[in-house]
Amino acid sequence: MSQSRTLRQKSQKYQENIEKRGVASPKKKEDGLNINPYVLGFIIFVVVGSTLLQILKGQ
């Protein structure tokens, strides 16, 4: 019994996939900070605001 052409192609594709298992492609390292400017502004607002409140309460 001979295999049909499509069956051979599927088998070959499967074999190539087997050899690639477990190999992760290296990810590009992104430079810079990945944070929304609004979120960064909110964090700075909270930190600076809480610092000012603590200074004013201490006096």
Curated annotation (Swiss-Prot):
Name the InterPro entries for this protein: ER_stress-assoc (IPR010580)
Localisation per UniProt entry: Membrane; Endoplasmic reticulum membrane
Q: Which domain of life is it from?
A: Eukaryota
An example Gene Ontology CC term for this record: endoplasmic reticulum
Cytoplasmic topological domain: 1-34
Q: How does it sit in the membrane?
A: Single-pass type IV membrane protein; Single-pass membrane protein
Region Disordered, annotated ranges: 1-30
Disulfide bond annotation, renumbered to this chain: none
Any coiled-coil regions, as ranges: none
Task: Please state what the protein is called.
Answer: Probable stress-associated endoplasmic reticulum protein
* Organism field: Dictyostelium discoideum
